[in-house]
């Protein structure tokens, strides 16, 4: 098996642009850059086989750079994806993000927005789960959702906007999150594939409004859900939201806790809902303290 270090050295020599008289006689340097890129890909493959993934990722980045110099944008985009895979598997999330951003930029400039959306969503997951950069993750999910929507992929678009809304709510952007749930409700009405998610969307929208201390808006959401979605009207989600609104209006945090326990006995509350419900409870308790 070839030595990857030697392959990269050969690539570096191959990838030097022609100058002076040599440039006049040799013409385009594209073929030199293509050969240099091939050598870097060979080195990356060897590193990959050895499970030296960060070195493999670095080699793929060098290959992509030569491919761009050769004018092979499509190949460079694919090579950036390979670099991303290596860095991600090697635990180097920062370099994985950089590589994927370069790939997405190429794909979208080439009009490949569906492919760009796929990787934009993946980018959001890394930013959210590995780097905990929620602001950038929100931007990624939102843009991916828009690109999927342009491609008429409603289910995938909704998946992105749900992630976006959930993160906005956890970041305290309750009104913005509520607005996104409104869009999800609108896009899901009459759609047989996503209409079963409506109950959860109405509940989440109402929870965000309660967390924003706007019980009046939450009551409107409850009424809207009961009138527009027959499945929501008599559902546990509807009854739960009504009970929460009543508890907030009465300023009774203990009553709110009881309603949460009752609901949890039938339908397990997920981490997101528990976090938002705790925020609502804290708001009630703050009001109770202010009265003392």
UniProtKB/Swiss-Prot annotation:
Range of residues in the leader sequence: none
SUPFAM superfamilies the UniProt entry points to: TPR-like (SSF48452)
Bilayer topology: Peripheral membrane protein
Gene Ontology terms, MF aspect: ATPase activator activity; soluble NSF attachment protein activity; syntaxin binding
Primary site of residence: membrane
Compartment annotation: Membrane
Chain's role: SNARE complex protein that binds to cis-SNARE complexes on membranes and is required for vesicular transport between the endoplasmic reticulum and the Golgi apparatus and for homotypic vacuole fusion. During the priming step of membrane fusion, is released from cis-SNARE complexes by SEC18 to establish a pool of unpaired SNAREs, which are required for interactions in trans during docking and fusion steps. Can displace HOPS from SNARE complexes, which may be a prerequisite for trans-SNARE complex disassembly and subsequent rounds of priming, docking and fusion.
PANTHER family per the UniProt record, alphabetical: ALPHA-SOLUBLE NSF ATTACHMENT PROTEIN, SOLUBLE NSF ATTACHMENT PROTEIN SNAP
Protein's name in the database: Alpha-soluble NSF attachment protein
Organism the protein comes from: Saccharomyces cerevisiae (strain ATCC 204508 / S288c) (Baker's yeast)
Source organism phylogeny: Eukaryota, Fungi, Dikarya, Ascomycota, Saccharomycotina
């Amino acid at each position: 098996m070839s030595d990857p270090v030697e392959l990269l050295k050969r690539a570096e020599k191959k990838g030097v642009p022609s100058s002076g008289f040599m440039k006049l006689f040799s013409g385009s340097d594209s073929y030199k850059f293509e050969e240099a890129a091939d050598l870097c890909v060979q080195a990356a493959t060897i590193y990959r086989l050895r499970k030296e993934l960060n070195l493999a990722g670095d080699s793929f980045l060098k290959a992509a750079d030569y491919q761009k110099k050769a004018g092979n944008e499509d190949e460079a985009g694919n090579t950036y994806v390979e670099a991303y895979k290596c860095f991600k598997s090697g635990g180097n999330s920062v370099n994985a993000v950089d590589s994927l951003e370069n790939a997405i930029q190429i794909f979208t400039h080439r009009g490949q927005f569906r492919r760009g959306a796929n990787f934009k969503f993946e980018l959001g997951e890394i930013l959210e789960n590995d780097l905990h950069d929620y602001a950038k993750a929100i931007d990624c999910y939102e843009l991916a959702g828009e690109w999927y929507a342009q491609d008429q992929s409603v289910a995938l678009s909704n998946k992105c906007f749900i992630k976006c809304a959930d993160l906005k709510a956890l970041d305290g952007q309750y009104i913005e999150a509520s607005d996104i749930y409104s869009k999800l409700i609108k896009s899901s009405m009459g759609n047989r594939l996503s209409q079963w998610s409506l109950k959860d969307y109405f509940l989440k929208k109402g929870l965000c409004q309660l967390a924003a201390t706007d019980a009046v808006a939450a009551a409107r959401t409850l009424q809207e859900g009961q009138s527009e979605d027959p499945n929501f009207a008599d559902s546990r989600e509807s009854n739960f939201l009504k009970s929460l609104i009543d508890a907030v209006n009465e300023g009774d945090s203990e009553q709110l806790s009881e309603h949460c326990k009752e609901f949890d006995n039938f339908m397990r509350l997920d981490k997101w809902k528990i976090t938002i419900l705790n925020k609502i409870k804290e708001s009630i308790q703050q009001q109770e303290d202010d009265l003392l």
